[in-house]
Amino acid sequence: MRLSRTAAVLAAALCPLLLQAQEPQKVTVMAKKYEFQPSRIEVKAGQPVEITFQSEDTKHGFECKDLKLEKVVFDKETPATVSFTPDKAGTYEFKCAKFCGMGHSKMKGEIVVTE
């Protein structure tokens, strides 16, 4: 009886920690006139990430080939969310994946994954 009570107390104490570890790191990125804000996103390796992209003007896109994240397109009315779990530290460039005007090629950012 004493062992099962100890196990129950231990499980109750650890449960919030386990749930917290699975909670995604959430970031909202605004896109407008050839820039992402923020253009630098810091996340931790091994933890789920959820990035929501919103546009303030026209259609834009997001693509990060180095993290094998597929292209998404979004506009003012329809945001897009990308979910992933980075497995190794590093700096990964992302870019706008939808032609949005003359400054399109400058529309870049980086995802910095730390240990």
Residue positions per predicted region:
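Surface-exposed loop/edge segments in extracytoplasmic proteins
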Residues: 69-72
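Short helix-initiation/N-cap motifs at beta->coil->alpha
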Residues: 33-36
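Soluble periplasmic/extracytoplasmic beta-strand elements of cell-envelope proteins
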Residues: 26-30, 48-52, 63, 93-95, ...
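Hydrophobic h-region of N-terminal signal peptides that target proteins for export
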Residues: 11-20
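Extracellular/periplasmic metallocenter environments
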Residues: 75-115
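Beta-strand cores of secreted/periplasmic/IMS beta-sandwich domains, seen most often
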Residues: 23-26, 39-58, 79-88, 114
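Bacterial N-terminal signal peptides that target proteins for export
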Residues: 1-10
